[in-house]
Amino acid sequence: MTGAGTAATSNLIRSLRAGADSLFIVGAHSDRFFLRKSSADANYLLPDLTHPRFFPALRRVLAKERIDLLIPTTDAEVRALVRPGRRLPCRLFLPRKAVVDVCQDKYRLNVRLRSRGVPVPATYPVSGLGAIDKTFRRLADHERVWCRIRVGSGSMGAIPVKRAEQARSWIAYWDEMRGVPATSFTLSEFLPGRDFSCQALWKAGELILTKTCERLSYFGGGSQPSGISSVSQLAKTVREPRVVEVCAAAIRALDRRASGTFNFDLRENARGVPCITEINVGRFASGTNVFDLTGQHNLAATFVRVALGRRVDLHEEYDAAEGYYTVRDLDTLTGVFRTDELFDRIVDARE
């Protein structure tokens, strides 16, 4: 497992140990400081993903430890592993390269899904600073507009704006200070409704298992210009069949033989329709515990079983475990609580 020692990988390891405690987990990272925090059974320091020696070193580790399955934890790793010619002495369970390429460009994804009738926000690419006024006129029916970078994660470069000059100044700042050109941005309708996350597992075009949650507050949201982030601080499990239907339609629009895990971000539009804003393809959400430590099925552990060719008696299973909350904060273990546990060991002294 890559990214050993990071919050995302540590959460994933926690989930796997809860669902399949006999697993021997090997962690790897290119940063020795993160690696020192890893909870894996064995840990290896690798060159950076961009270094020519990365894949030779990775192959040596995979062979030495007789690894059965490699699980990437970042978009860059997923992108690198699906390239043609990447021969590894173990299994991968990832979507096809064409699917990864589309999903990792939010505008391309938006165009593909819209053309297939899947709900997405109205979105336009920025061709240059001089074209922003024209785009705003196309979005004139919306009080606010969402300005964002079309690649990457963590809500990088995302901000709500009301006027064209706000978007122009924001994009110009990123160009001058961070080297991100105007053409890397999109402008779209602002979605004002509820914010959902969905994780789904597919194999050969068959939906196996889906889980959903709703983000209620955001980690670091108060310090973000947008007031939100893709990382929830407080989330709850929910039963939302509409969300599952939209996500399933999206995958079928992308690949009729889809395999792997897909993490969806969705938000309701003004009419209450859940719209897909992005799909993190081939990897788990950093807050995967909400999907793995609740309900009848541990999604991460099920992923491993399916990836290794084990039989699982699940077909289009929607494991909606209502009544759980997760709480996340810096340098603390993710808390997973049932509703009836929220006030355990708490005395109300407000009166």
Give the positions of each predicted feature.
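ATP-binding N-terminal substructure of ATP-dependent carboxylate-amine bond-forming enzymes
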Residues: M1-P95, G130
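ATP-dependent carboxylate/phosphate-activation module, predominantly the ATP-grasp catalytic core
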Residues: E165, S169-D175, A182, S188-D195, ...
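Active-site nucleotide/adenylate-binding loops and adjacent lid/helix of ATP-dependent enzymes
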Residues: V100-F185, P192, A204, V244-E245
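Short, charged, surface-exposed secondary-structure boundary motifs
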Residues: R36-S38, R53-P56, D101-Y107, S155, ...
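ATP-dependent carboxylate activation and anion-phosphoryl transfer catalytic cores
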Residues: E65, F219, R239-E351
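Conserved hydrophobic "DFG−1" position in protein kinase catalytic cores
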Residues: P160, E189, A200, L266-E268
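Preference for protein termini
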Residues: M1-D31, E65-R66, G179, A204-E206, ...
